[in-house]
């Protein structure tokens, strides 16, 4: 597995490179945004670890350009920017995970391995798929097991958010912030979140044996393929 690290702090970059190499990965390190973007566009990587506050091209712009170019490799944002606004922005731009500095290497390694083994979710420029649930981002058509599912615009956005973060526990507060940011139709009221998820679940899960949308009691929700 080949990983690209885009990190301008030399000590942090060397620390990450050494640790990931010892864990068995092939690692490239770019110490500026332009070089990192060029490498990500021209070479094949299984994962990109990307800082946001880079001296030339920032991480926000890099991930935006990568996704616009159809690059679908997992991206883990590693940054000192830790507010919920920053987290939501990163995830919405196309990041697959977000880790705030300072961090424990053991946690970063666990997140890296999780991202690399997500073989059940396929993400291309226009299609999202989990198990037998398919979402076409261009036509905005949703189907499960070949059956068409009609969603409202808000339900579609919520489903896309869940699929892009398949296997992650999403707190109600994060879902609320995301939906307000996109549609301005929810408050932080957890009941509103529960209602929105219940309506989505009724359409994508109720008529099927395998339930993809799971409740994590006391925390929030998660979209995943249950173990057989």
Curated annotation (Swiss-Prot):
The keyword Transcription is annotated on this UniProt entry: yes
CDD domains listed in its UniProt record: REC_OmpR_CusR-like, trans_reg_C
Pfam families for the chain: Response_reg, Trans_reg_C
Main location: cytoplasm
Keyword entries, A-Z: Cytoplasm, DNA-binding, Phosphoprotein, Plasmid, Transcription, Transcription regulation, Two-component regulatory system
Segments of the chain annotated as binding DNA: 125-225
Annotated InterPro entries: CheY-like_superfamily (IPR011006), CusR-like (IPR006291), OmpR/PhoB-type_DNA-bd (IPR001867), Sig_transdc_resp-reg_C-effctor (IPR016032), Sig_transdc_resp-reg_receiver (IPR001789), WalR-like (IPR039420), WH-like_DNA-bd_sf (IPR036388)
Location in or out of the cell: Cytoplasm
GO molecular function, one term: phosphorelay response regulator activity
Protein's UniProt keywords contain Transcription regulation: yes
Modified residues (4-aspartylphosphate): 51
BP-aspect Gene Ontology terms: regulation of DNA-templated transcription
Record's function text: Component of the sil cation-efflux system that confers resistance to silver. Probable member of a two-component regulatory system SilS/SilR.
Identification of the protein by name: Probable transcriptional regulatory protein SilR
Species: Salmonella typhimurium
